[in-house]
Every structure is written in structure tokens, then in C-alpha cells.
Amino acid sequence: MAKDIEYNETARRKLLEGVNKLANAVKVTLGPKGRNVVIDKKFGAPTITKDGVTVAKEIELEDPLENMGAQMVKEVSTKTNDVAGDGTTTATILAQSIINEGLKNVTAGANPMSLKRGIDKAVTAAVESIQKRAVKIENKKDIANVASISANNDNTIGNLIADAMDKVGKDGVITVEEAKSIETTLDVVEGMQFDRGYISPYMVTDAESMVATLNDPFILIYDKKISSMKDLIHILEKVAQAGKPLVIISEEVEGEALATIVVNTLRKTISCVAVKAPGFGDRRKSMLEDIAILTGGQVISEDLGMKLENTTLQMLGRANKVTVDKENTTIIEGKGQTKEIQGRIGQIKKQIEDTTSEYDREKLQERLAKLAGGVAVIHVGAATEVEMKEKKARVEDALSATRAAVEEGIVPGGGLTLLKAQEAVGSLKLDGDEATGAKIIFRALEEPIRMITSNAGLEGSVIVEHAKAKKGNEGFNALTMVWEDMIQAGVVDPAKVVRSALQNAASIGSMILTTEVTITDKPDKDAPNPMAGMGGGGMGGMGGMM
């Protein structure tokens, strides 16, 4: 296919137009007084959102060159969202400012590579300034403040997320689901839970609720099918002699083995529940290993030369309680060694860092949470489906931002931290075009606060000058329209969000500034229209239908 090739200023100007089209659509959502964006959907009701990344993801431009610029800035918001969960609009505004100011200088004859070096040095100085201002999160109130701000100042969501983190810990799994009612609620499941229920309903201990509850049981973890009774009989006898219940987790329990377990359970000879192992393939092996470490047992695996009939009580796991219903199994207070559990948690965290697959990362995070203790589910309720989707997106954003805050601490919000980072950038000793590159960042750092106040209906430049003159953490709260200490007022951002927004914006900004050539597919003017000849006449033979 033929290509369109554009050079120098022509290429950069087109990219800039695309950048501005996307950024101008995204930046109206910034701040507590940010406006809504309504997005048309092919099917169903339109989406109404104040989430920058949701707006950015919807934008595709007709002109291929402009679209390239827009897609590059879209990368800024999606990358920031992936890393920190919030700050997408801030990142887009920073990128727009860096690109606009930078291209003015490139057009005026500045060397793009020298500008890039200056930008990189200025960003490093600004990031150090952000990290110095960061305050570690100590209490539930701080967590609630961060979550509320990320959820567009919704205190209900903020408090729910703070409660969830309080109950399951900062590494615990918190999932967000749609509720069946209009209430937004929090449910917490303690211990490790996986989505496999009992193999036979005859194993339940409470026929009314159809749940099997076993106190202080032994747990047999086996990675193959159990069908022969002779493999299982001696372990059942040993457990019965010990006077304890037994939980069997294996690929499958069937045939005479299942019949024997059911008969002995009904006769009350032994209390035993069999469940299928969670997951599939290699992931199943890993999850069985997790359960073994959590309960202090071993996976009886024929791959390692172990035989089921040779299993001893010492190889079985233990837990304070196991509850099994039709669909889920929950292991509460497994009796594994804390040191081994922590080692396994560290190993999974390393795998999360190393994996490139989004799906694998999600599954690893689920495993991490199950080991780290507890699963909290936030059920998001709303009156309409449109509101439900918008609210659910805000809860997910707030959750990610809160995790980021716990990780790297919080800084004053409202664009103040970026503005104060100007001091660090201004003190750099640079010459020539490198100094110009640093000035580009210096100017960009005041754009978020300018936009927040502009969206609140005030003159941004006036607020920026006042904010520069203020000391400490005093800034302008656009929600209450007063000057106050931002941290005490609860107007805070996670340091990781602010840092990621600046670094990602500078990265893409530098890429566009150093672009000299663009290559796009030339539109094929002679392409036949697939719908040609189908219009006007209707379908033959259908004339009598009118």
C-alpha cells in the first residue's frame, strides 16, 4: 500500500493538532468542579463520565496524522492509569503543555535532543521534590480522604474503601462488583476462598443452609483424581482415630472413593468433605501449593514420586475452620508457618512485577490476596445502569489510587505539589537549549492548578500567582473555594500518581518533540464501496409487502 510521508514542521504540526483535540476533551474533567463528558454508544444509553482515561479511550480521529498524535497522548493516560490508577487527566494536561511549549521552541530553531536532555533533568529534579513532600499514610482517615478525592469527592466510596483496607490489609484483595440494589455495600470474606464447592450435597453438616462447616480439620491436598478406595482407606482410618474432620482437595473424587466417603459421612463415622481443586493446568498446581503453604501441609503429587496410599497425618494441612457451600470453599486461619507464607507472598509479588500479561497479573494478584488474608467485595449500587457504570468506574479508580497512596505516601493535592516542584526545577544550573527544556517543564508544572481553578469558574493565572506566594502546604481548595492547608483539609493525592503523571507526560512529550518524519497509509480513493448498488431499489420480490 502507498504511504504518505511528512517531514519536519508539517509532521509535527499535524501531530500537535491531534494532541490538542484529545487533551481539550479530557481536561474539562479535572478537579472537583470538573465537567461531564457524554459519550455516544452504538447500543444502549450514552456513557456519562468525569474519568479522563475513559474519555481518552473513546477518541479516534479521522485524519491519520492527527490520530497518531492523539493516540500517543492516549498512551500517557492509559500508562498512568495502569501504574497508579489515577492522575490520567493531570498526565494529559502536562503532556499537552510540554508538547505545545516544546514545539514552539523547535520551530524557533532549538535543538530537539538538547531540549529532551533539559526536560529529563528537570523531571528528575521535580520527582525528587515530589518524593520529599510525600507523607506516609498512617490512619484510616487519610485512606478515606485519598479514596474520596479520586472518586470525585464521594465520601461514601472513600469510607467504604477505607473500611475494606482496614479489614483485609493493604495486600488483601478488594474487588468491585455491581449490586442488585441501589445501596453500595461492603462484604468481607476472611481467610482464603476459592470458587469450588462440595462434590456431593450429602457432605453438608447443616442441611438447612446446605453448608459444610468443619472445625479444626485435616486437609488432604492431592493433584490427581481419586477413584479407588484402597488409596484412601488408610488415611480415612488415621483421621478417624485422631477424631478430626477431613477436607479433601483434589482434581476429582469419583466412583467407589466418593461412595465410601458419603456412606461414612452419613453414618457419622467420619466428617469428610471433598472439593475439586481450583484453577486449571499450571495455575492449579500453583494454587494447590498456595493452599499447602497456608495450611502447613504438602501437595501429594505423583510428579514428585509421592503415592496417596503412603500419605501420613504429618503431610496433611490444618486450619481452624473450613466452610464449604455449593460454590465456594473458605479456609479460615490456616496453620502454616508465617515465615513460609511471607516467602510465598514475596515470590508472587516478584512474579507480578515480571509478568507482561495483564491476565496473568490479575490472576497472580488474586492469589496474592488470598494468601495475604481476606477478600473484600464492594457491591456498587445505583438507580440506573448509566449511573451504575459511571460509579463503578469511579470506585475502581479510587481503589487503585488508594493502593498507590499506601505504597508511596500522599502529597498536597489540587495541583499544589507540582507547582511547588517548580522551585527544584528553577534551581537547576543549565545552559542553552537544555535550560529551555527545563523551562518547558517549569511552565507545565503550573498547568494542572490553572485548569482546576479554571474549571471551577475562576481565573487560573491569578490563583497560580497567589499559590506561589503561599508557604508550606497552603493551597486553593477548589471544592470549598477557600485557601487552606491542603493536607489538613484532606485534599491529597498519592505521590505515586503525581510522579507517574509527570514522568509519563515528559516521556511522550519528548518523543513528539524529537519526531522528524511521520509515515501513514495513503487513503485508497479507488476502493470499491461494498454497499454500492444496494441502495434505492429495496429488495427484489418484496414489492407487495407495503
UniProtKB/Swiss-Prot annotation:
A single Gene Ontology MF term assigned here is: unfolded protein binding
- What does the record give as EC number? 5.6.1.7
Give UniProt keywords alphabetically: ATP-binding, Chaperone, Cytoplasm, Isomerase, Nucleotide-binding, Stress response
GO annotation terms (biological process) = chaperone cofactor-dependent protein refolding; protein refolding; response to heat
Q: PROSITE patterns attached here?
A: CHAPERONINS_CPN60
Organism for this UniProt entry: Leptospira interrogans serogroup Icterohaemorrhagiae serovar Lai (strain 56601)
Coiled-coil region(s)? none
| CC per GO annotation | GroEL-GroES complex
Which HAMAP family does the record associate with it? CH60
* TM regions (residue ranges): none
Q: What family, per the record? A: Belongs to the chaperonin (HSP60) family.
Q: Report the function annotation for this chain.
A: Together with its co-chaperonin GroES, plays an essential role in assisting protein folding. The GroEL-GroES system forms a nano-cage that allows encapsulation of the non-native substrate proteins and provides a physical environment optimized to promote and accelerate protein folding.
Mind telling me which Pfam families this protein's record contains?
Cpn60_TCP1
- Report quaternary structure and partners: Forms a cylinder of 14 subunits composed of two heptameric rings stacked back-to-back. Interacts with the co-chaperonin GroES.
This protein's name: Chaperonin GroEL
What does the UniProt entry say about where the protein is found? Cytoplasm
Name the major location: cytoplasm
Entries under SUPFAM superfamilies matching the protein: GroEL apical domain-like, GroEL equatorial domain-like, GroEL-intermediate domain like
Going by the entry's taxonomy, the superkingdom of the source organism is recorded as Bacteria
In the UniProt record, what gene is named as encoding this protein? Answer: groEL
Q: Where does ATP bind?
A: 29-32, 50, 86-90, 414, 477-479, 493
